[in-house]
Amino acid sequence: MPSQTLKIENARYVVTLDVERRIIRDGSILVEGRRIRRVGKAAELAGTPADRVIDAHHLVVTPGFVNGHMHISYAHAVRGIFPDDLGSPLGHVFRLQMAMTEEEEYYTTLLGLVELLRNGTVCFVDPGSTKHPDACLQAYEDAGIRVILGECVSDREAPFPLPRHGTEEAIARTASFLEKWDGRLEGRLRAWAMPFSPETCSADLLRGVKRVADERGTGLTLHHNSGPEARRESLVRHGLRPTEHLESIGVLGPNVLLSHALGLDEAEIECLARTGTAVAMCPVTAAKGGRGVAEHGRMPELLARGVRVALGCDSPNNSNHLDLVRTMNMAAIQYKDARRDMRQIPAERALEMATLMGAQALGLGDEQGSVAPGKRADLVLFDTRRPEWQALFNPVNNLVYNADGRSVHTVIVDGRVVVDAYRQSFVDEDRLFARVQEIGERLLVRTGVTLPGSRWPIV
């Protein structure tokens, strides 16, 4: 049976992210099966037949977004419960997460997938927070999204209820997870090694799971260096900065993605550049959490040294949204203010981090991240018939500085339309919203988690 064809016809702009970074006015795209076959001016593809044609005269097309650090699991059920003066929420996070049943995690994951797709994310890394992957597999399959999963492992005591195992058991569990999950859903699901952090994992564990990832040709991600406190602790414990410590034990490299990476200094940036290690930065989480981005953030220096940087939304209770357009905006503006230099992180670079560079950080740059023949057909179509898109002269500026995910009109993953004219068809949203509200209410009662409510009276 021949592959189905899809034509996106006469787009107002196609922002390709190809080698030349072309923006094609009045562009068309031909998709055959799961891949892009042709990209060019509408006149060049005029008359080319397709099984389905999308009239895109009012749409701006970009590559699908890549979310490099996104805890998909529990948080939708209890979103917004953490007050501004809580401090670290991690104790509550793991208490709530570990209490979730398979059914509860399935529905909260499903809601997360709805939000990701409706905001243009086609691929994300869940850094080990999914407790019941067997239960969530159907949600990933129905949604049609790309996902990178792993089992969170640690072998040291943590100041919060993190799952802990013996070193050899943790390595074996990682190997078993990769064997079971990597490559499922016709390749849309990848499995990585996911030690939680250098503070909660011994050097033997980190070396062991890195070896497993290398042997299987897959990746490794971990939370890393989330501020100057982590640097001080590492200097006391190892006599080395956190990134230098990872390099010294052989746990850096092109298949490693360090998440957050906020408290880096010049020596650590050099480690990352020298080893080809990538980072996933969560600018909204960092700003909302008061992490001192203006003082400790080093995104411009990382980019200047050629380090691959992905963007992440982190969690619905950290950034509190799963909208990479808003995340791009934060990445583009916060360093302009911090450095008092409007040239920092231009809009084009922010879009690169959410698309092509983000895919490269995940080792997927050959397959996705740009609108080019041979690439996977992962595309987002933005509706310019909205006030925030007016007037339109520079589509990248309008996207990064004007818009947000609410203008996502259509999303295509692997050649399949998964959001069609603002609507997804894999779940009844009203019923899902009601179900997740009930789950959250039950979860808070069951765990005994109580936090201050609204500062203003609810009457």
Task: Kindly give the residue locations of the regions a language model identified.
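Metal-coordinating catalytic core of metallo-dependent amide/deamination hydrolases
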Residues: 136-269
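Histidine/acidic-residue-rich catalytic or RNA/ligand-binding cores of hydrolases
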Residues: 228-240, 268-274, 290-302, 317-336, ...
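Active-site gating loops and adjacent loop-to-helix segments of metal-dependent hydrolytic enzymes
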Residues: 76-107, 148-171, 228-255, 275-278, ...
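Alpha-helical scaffold segments that flank or form the walls of functional sites
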Residues: 78-145, 170-184, 437-445
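His/Asp/Glu-enriched, well-ordered alpha-helical/loop segment
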Residues: 248-255, 300-386, 402-404
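Active-site microenvironment of metallo-dependent hydrolases
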Residues: 1-27, 32-37, 42, 352-459
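Glycine-enriched alpha-helix->loop->beta-strand junction motifs that scaffold or abut catalytic
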Residues: 144-146, 214-219, 251-254, 271-280, ...
